[in-house]
């Protein structure tokens, strides 16, 4: 028995060493999937080839390790099972390559669902396509036979350990290269991150800066200096945006409160904002493009689904809206309470903003919120013949902190937040009251801001990146990023425009709609909104908004008014109703899935 285990294990090690090499060759289209406008550098070439070898081998590794559990089987049976697993992996990678070449998306639950439920309505696969696919798989199997033959030769040789060592060293080197380049704000290699399925490369900026391996000040300068480098497979915008400023250029001020749930936008909790709201257009059914800061801010400024985040982050591509404001001479006043590096808004939304303050000096969110308020008030007082774009992002509600002597309005409240105590039986009102106290504090700061703003010449947008849940569904969801229910994605939106009458709008709107509205309000834009956005004008009541795409850090959802389809990594999806219960009676229409797929792939280069 021991001899059989030893023999099978030795062969499996040799097979994995050879199979990793074979996978990297068989899946060569992954390496070629970027539309590169410039010749590859030597480092880029090494990174592409080495990541192909290292990462695909790493994906195969768990399957090989699980096979060890069967090493007690007779040799032929054991090898047969391992080879069958390898064939399945090859087919999986082949299908993923075909999907990626078509949609610039790797296989996910949405595509699988479309295939089985949409059938020929979505995927038009001819018999010739099937024949070509089967033929290509047959060729891959022939190559696998050669791999098995080499493995048999190496099974009793120490060369297999050399190959394994080389594979591990190559994998490690690619991750170290990515971490180092990422710390430098250099997208030389990170732009290729979307090439491979399940690829999440290593980042270690805090460690690198802490140990002085890279000078953080120099790195932050690179963030601006790399502005004009164009290296990505994005096709954004779809056509050049040409604008002409209108006769009067108003200032624009975005005030965002992190984690502000719609139900707490009340006169009791937010008296200053509520009073100001009487002068605004109040969008009562406004939805964020995500349940996280990253997704919410991305959807607001880019007017695109958060599924594009990784590509924009890797290529450090700033949004059309910010580019246009800067090109038209707007001064930038960007004031974030939380660091603008987490999530990395400094490398995306505000990529081209010079002299950007990445982090405020305050120790607490209370101090930092006060700091950004004071800094903005000073900024907008500066004499200038040019308009400004202001961005204020308050953080106290996210951390549920506030000056307790002055702003403890809602009692009793949780005196110290200890997340480990949260469960279905916890009294949510204690936590919620603490949260409302922090909103009450933020409201006082927003009140100070609004007193100092020239409302005769300033457009003011007040909203949030996402909502906040306090176990509303009795399913132990607390905070955000947990689901796509209204309490986590429904946010306030108040838009103040000089000379526009206040009103309340009750149809659904989304974060995707804000930028198209601003662009057409501020400028005469040549071209269509769809060339840079999936949104519509906020004031267009006829625009289709029954479904929209909401994102998070790890999954996304197609959100309707009564139904949502949540798509998770690894091929699992769920249909839920608004109460987050599994919905089996209704189904998301195939045309909605098809349209959503187009929205998630439209801004990638084809071919």
Language-model features: where?
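Histidine-centered active-site microenvironments of extracellular/periplasmic hydrolases
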Residues: 454-499, 545
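Active-site-proximal alpha/beta segments of enzymes that process anionic O-linked groups
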Residues: 170-419, 535
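A short beta-strand-to-alpha-helix junction
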Residues: 312-317, 429-441, 483-489, 500-518, ...
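A long, amphipathic alpha-helix that forms part
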Residues: 198, 220-221, 374-381, 415-458
